[in-house]
C-alpha cells in the first residue's frame, strides 16, 4: 500500500507553546496533524452519454490490466457541506455478500489506492467502495474534520441508495486518519462490522502522548465515540507504529463494546502491516467465519 504520510507528532517548541498558550479550534489541530493531500493521481472523465471512466497518471502505480481498470466504477457525489467528492467502486467479488466502505490514509488518493483495493478485495472476497476526502483527488473543498464526517456520510448514502447495499452487508474499514470518519459513522449507524487499522484516540493524544482526557479544542475524538459503536469491531495495529503509537489501538480496543480478538502485528510499523501474512489471515477469519456466527 502507498505510504500513509510522515510522523504526526513532530512538533517544534514554538508549536507546543502555541497549542497550550493559545488553544486552537479543532479544525486548526486537524489541519496541522493529519492532512497531506498528494497531487491528484487520477481524473474522472464523462462522455456525452454521461458515463464516467477512470484515468490514472503514472504516479498511481497501476498494477493490473486495462480490462480491470475499465471495470472500476467512478462517480462524483455532493456532500451536505456542498463539496463534490470522488467515489470508486471496485467489484472484486461480484458474488460476495460484503462490501467494504474503505476510508484511506492521509497522504494518498483513490488513484494510488485502486490497485490495493483490487488485491485486497479479491483475497478476502469482498467488494470495495471508497471515496476521497474533500481536497483530495478530484474532490473539491478543503480537508477538515467536519468535512471528513460529511464525506463518509455522502459515500455511505451512495452505497446505500445508488447501489442498494444494505447496512448488514457493509463493513466499514478505516486506516489511520480514515479511522476517524469510520468511527464517527459507525457510532451513528449499525453495519455488519467495523475494521480499525492503526486507529488514533484523538489528535492531541497523537501529538502529546501524556494527554489523559479530551479537551474542548481537541480534534478527532474517536476514543469518546467508539463506545457507541454497536457493530463488531476488529482493531489492527503494529506494535512498533512510529506515527500512531500502539497504545492508541489498545485503548480503542478496550473501549469497544463488541470488540473481537484484535490483531497486534509484532514488529510492524504504520505503513507495513499489509506485508505480514497474519493481516490477510485475520481479515479472512473475521469476515468468513466470525461474522457468520456473530
UniProtKB/Swiss-Prot annotation:
It is a lipid-anchor. It is found in: Recycling endosome membrane; Cell projection, Dendritic spine; Postsynaptic density membrane. InterPro entries: AB_hydrolase_fold, Hydrolase_4. The active site is at 176 (charge relay system), 241 (charge relay system), 270 (charge relay system). Keywords: Cell membrane, Cell projection, Endosome, Hydrolase, Lipoprotein, Membrane, Palmitate, Postsynaptic cell membrane, Synapse. Its EC number is 3.1.2.22. One of its GO terms (biological process) is regulation of postsynapse organization. Pfam families: Hydrolase_4. It catalyses: S-hexadecanoyl-L-cysteinyl-[protein] + H2O = L-cysteinyl-[protein] + hexadecanoate + H(+). Palmitoylated on cysteine residues located in a cysteine cluster at the N-terminus which promotes membrane localization. One of its GO terms (molecular function) is palmitoyl-(protein) hydrolase activity. One of its GO terms (cellular component) is endosome membrane. Transmembrane segments: none annotated. Hydrolyzes fatty acids from S-acylated cysteine residues in proteins. Has depalmitoylating activity towards nras. Belongs to the AB hydrolase superfamily. ABHD17 family. This is Alpha/beta hydrolase domain-containing protein 17C.
Amino acid at each position: 500500500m502507498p505510504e500513509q504520510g510522515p510522523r504526526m507528532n513532530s512538533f517544534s517548541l514554538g508549536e507546543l507553546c502555541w497549542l497550550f498558550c493559545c488553544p486552537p479550534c479543532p479544525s486548526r489541530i486537524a489541519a496541522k496533524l493529519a492532512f497531506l493531500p498528494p497531487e491528484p493521481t487520477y481524473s474522472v472523465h464523462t462522455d456525452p452519454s454521461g458515463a464516467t471512466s477512470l484515468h490514472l497518471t503514472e504516479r498511481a502505480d497501476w498494477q493490473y490490466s486495462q480490462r480491470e481498470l475499465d471495470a472500476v466504477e467512478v462517480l462524483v457525489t455532493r456532500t451536505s457541506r456542498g463539496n463534490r467528492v470522488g467515489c470508486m467502486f471496485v467489484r472484486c467479488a461480484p458474488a460476495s455478500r460484503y462490501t467494504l466502505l474503505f476510508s484511506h490514509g492521509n497522504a494518498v488518493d483513490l488513484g494510488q489506492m485502486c490497485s490495493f483495493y483490487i488485491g485486497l478485495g479479491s483475497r478476502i472476497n469482498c467488494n470495495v467502495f471508497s471515496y476521497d476526502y474533500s481536497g483530495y483527488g478530484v474532490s473539491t473543498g478543503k480537508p477538515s474534520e467536519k468535512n471528513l464526517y460529511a464525506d463518509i456520510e455522502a459515500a455511505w448514502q451512495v452505497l446505500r441508495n445508488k447501489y442498494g447495499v444494505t447496512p448488514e452487508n457493509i463493513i466499514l474499514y478505516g486506516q489511520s486518519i480514515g479511522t476517524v470518519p469510520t468511527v464517527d459513522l459507525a457510532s451513528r449507524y449499525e453495519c455488519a462490522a467495523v475494521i480499525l487499522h492503526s486507529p488514533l484516540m484523538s489528535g492531541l493524544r497523537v501529538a502529546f502522548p501524556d494527554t489523559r482526557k479530551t479537551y474542548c479544542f481537541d480534534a478527532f475524538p474517536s476514543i469518546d465515540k467508539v463506545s457507541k459503536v454497536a457493530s463488531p469491531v476488529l482493531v489492527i495495529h503494529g506494535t512498533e507504529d512510529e506515527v500512531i503509537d500502539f497504545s492508541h489501538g489498545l485503548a480503542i480496543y478496550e473501549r469497544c463494546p463488541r470488540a473481537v480478538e484484535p490483531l497486534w502485528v509484532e514488529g510492524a510499523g504504520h505503513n507495513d502491516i499489509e506485508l505480514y501474512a497474519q493481516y490477510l489471515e485475520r481479515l479472512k477469519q473475521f469476515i468468513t467465519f466470525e461474522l457468520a456466527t456473530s
